[in-house]
């Protein structure tokens, strides 16, 4: 699949997952995805499972506030986390939801060592790898002075 229309793609993915969990037999015909007779082969433990969506940039964070139960941040500073939470709140309000109904969580990669330099060395490869694989996130890293 060509990765286009990320906002529409996210909306449809969340719709599809909710439909599968609720009914287990899904027909979905959207702008991005076209699914006929998807049948989940097992019964979910619950029909409603909170959906958290990973996002970094303002528009997608606002979409998280509109359609999910939580936004997952990654590799971010406290300043970015504060700004991200503000965008999630905007999205929640736009959808008529209370901002407090949408959680903001973060993946916090770290290295533990008795030696500070050794811990830094352990993080160099993951930081470089992430920056190399996800070019759009370089903008976030530069702004955060990583």
Summary of predicted features, one role per range:
Residues 51-54, 71-73, 102-109:
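Hydrophobic faces of well-ordered beta-strands that scaffold small-molecule active sites
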Residues 63-72:
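Glycine-enriched alpha-helix->loop->beta-strand junction motifs that scaffold or abut catalytic
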Residues 59-61:
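Short, glycine/polar-rich helix-capping loops at beta-to-alpha or helix-loop-helix junctions
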Residues 3-40, 81-146:
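An alpha-helical appendage that flanks or caps ligand/catalytic pockets
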Residues 76-80:
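Short, acidic/turn-prone active-site loops that include or flank metal/cofactor-
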Residues 21, 55, 75:
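Residues that line or immediately flank small-molecule/substrate-binding pockets and catalytic motifs
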Residues 42-46, 65:
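Solvent-exposed alpha-helices and their adjacent loops that cap or buttress functional pockets
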Residues 24, 47-51:
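Generic beta-strand structural signal
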């Amino acid at each position: 699949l060509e990765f286009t229309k990320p906002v529409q793609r996210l909306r449809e993915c969340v719709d599809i997952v909710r439909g599968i969990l609720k009914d287990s037999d899904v027909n979905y015909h959207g702008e991005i995805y076209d699914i006929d007779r998807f049948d989940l082969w097992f019964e979910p433990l619950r029909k409603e499972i909170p959906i958290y969506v990973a996002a970094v940039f303002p528009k997608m964070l606002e979409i998280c506030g509109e359609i999910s139960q939580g936004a997952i941040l990654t590799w971010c500073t406290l300043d970015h986390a504060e700004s991200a939470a503000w965008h999630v709140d905007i999205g929640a309000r736009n959808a008529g939801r209370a901002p407090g109904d949408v959680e903001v969580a973060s993946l916090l990669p770290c290295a533990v060592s008795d030696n500070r330099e050794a811990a830094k060395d352990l993080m160099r490869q993951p930081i470089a790898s992430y920056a190399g694989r996800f070019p759009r996130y370089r903008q976030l890293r530069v702004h955060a002075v990583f």
